[in-house]
């Protein structure tokens, strides 16, 4: 009898992102669901699509009654609530259900950008200097310009625009106020590393071919992956951003980038697969910008593109993700083993 796999995902619904024009990042999960379903069917699995909607108690009951041998976790959190992304692996762990991808602890740690950066620093991994600031604490600013101002607990580049990069006090005040008002709480301000930009996907314990992001933008537009660069095809950022995979880099650069990606993967306690985003600073030093557990794996995304470059093909990529989860069956309960000492909630 064929093994039954449940693809668990968040059913797109109205959310706070609708009013900010950022809803496309939420609905994109459906593209991943369709592609993963097709790949799993090709691999001979019996597939059940399992969309989840709030409230948490009812969603937990759905997971507990799946009757599947494996949960393929594509859940990104309920709409407008990225902090709920850890919900599915947490319930699966409680019920001893095998699931793909990262544990809930890693998802929660990576989403809180300051806690993640502290963890990376504890593990000896370079990341841009940073502060948490609100409109009331701007007087404490101590970093060097240019800086980038980000929401503290968002993913998918929510809240990132061309104006997010600031070079003076007036612009800093404006962006901190915008982020604090639009996304709640304090803003993450970090020194902007504006050199070459790379990302690498870790699959199991293997680092896939590195990608480099290139920019062909008008003068004065900061080189960074804004929300528009990822989700708005008609925007200058989308049209002016490109990806080279495999990146044209030396063997030494490949070794450095891949080693940093794997170290970051382990530092955050990831399992299965994750993408690590990195940039060079003005001195040519590689800095980790972000660790993305369970990144978007729709065809054409960074992780899928790197799997293609590795010769896996999309179906082979999904097969490797399943194999990484199956490996955990022999190591139950799932391990959460980030490096470094305990950290505060900052």
Q: Where is each model-derived feature located?
A:
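ATP-binding N-terminal substructure of ATP-dependent carboxylate-amine bond-forming enzymes
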Residues: 1-98, 105, 109-111, 134-139, ...
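Active-site nucleotide/adenylate-binding loops and adjacent lid/helix of ATP-dependent enzymes
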Residues: 2-9, 64-67, 107-196
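A short beta-strand motif that forms the metal-chelation/ATP-contact edge
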Residues: 3-5, 72, 148, 199-205, ...
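Short acidic/His/Gly/Ser-rich catalytic and metal-binding motifs that mark active-site loops
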Residues: 14-18, 155-158, 234-237, 299-300
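Short glycine-enriched, charge-decorated loop/helix-capping segments at active-site entrances
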Residues: 20-26, 161-166, 304-306
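Hydrophobic beta-strand scaffold residues
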Residues: 47, 98-99, 127, 147, ...
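ATP-dependent carboxylate activation and anion-phosphoryl transfer catalytic cores
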Residues: 119, 124, 248-346
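Phosphate-binding site of ATP-dependent enzymes
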Residues: 169-259, 280-287
């Amino acid at each position: 009898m064929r093994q039954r796999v449940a693809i668990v995902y968040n059913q797109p619904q109205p959310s706070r992102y609708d009013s900010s024009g950022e809803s496309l990042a939420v609905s994109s999960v459906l593209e991943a669901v369709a592609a993963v379903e097709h790949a799993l069917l090709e691999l001979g699995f019996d597939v059940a699509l399992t969309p989840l909607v709030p409230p948490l108690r009812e969603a937990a009951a759905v997971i507990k009654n799946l009757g599947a041998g494996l949960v393929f976790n594509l859940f990104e959190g309920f709409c407008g609530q990225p902090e709920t992304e850890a919900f599915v692996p947490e319930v699966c762990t409680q019920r001893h259900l095998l699931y793909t991808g990262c544990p809930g602890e890693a998802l929660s740690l990576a989403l809180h950008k300051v806690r993640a950066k502290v963890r990376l620093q504890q593990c000896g991994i370079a990341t841009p200097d940073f502060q948490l600031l609100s409109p009331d604490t701007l007087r404490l600013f101590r970093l060097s310009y240019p800086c980038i101002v980000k929401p503290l607990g968002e993913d998918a580049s929510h809240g990132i625009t061309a104006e997010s990069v600031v070079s003076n006090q007036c612009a800093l005040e404006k962006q901190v106020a915008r982020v604090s008002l639009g996304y709640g709480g304090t803003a993450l301000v970090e020194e902007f590393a504006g050199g070459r930009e790379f990302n690498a996907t870790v699959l199991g314990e293997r680092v896939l071919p590195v990608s480099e992001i290139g920019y062909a933008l008008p003068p004065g537009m900061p080189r960074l992956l804004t929300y528009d660069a990822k989700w708005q095809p008609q925007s200058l950022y989308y049209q002016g951003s490109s990806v080279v995979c495999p990146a044209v880099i030396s063997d030494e650069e490949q070794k450095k980038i891949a080693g940093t990606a794997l170290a970051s993967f382990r530092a955050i306690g990831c399992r299965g697969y994750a993408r690590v985003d990195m940039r060079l600073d003005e001195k040519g030093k590689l800095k980790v910008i972000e660790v993305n557990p369970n990144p978007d794996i729709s065809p054409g995304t960074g992780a899928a593109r790197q799997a293609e470059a590795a010769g896996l093909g999309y179906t082979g990529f999904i097969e490797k993700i399943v194999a990484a989860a199956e490996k955990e069956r022999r190591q139950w309960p799932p391990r959460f083993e980030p490096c470094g000492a305990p950290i505060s909630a900052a």
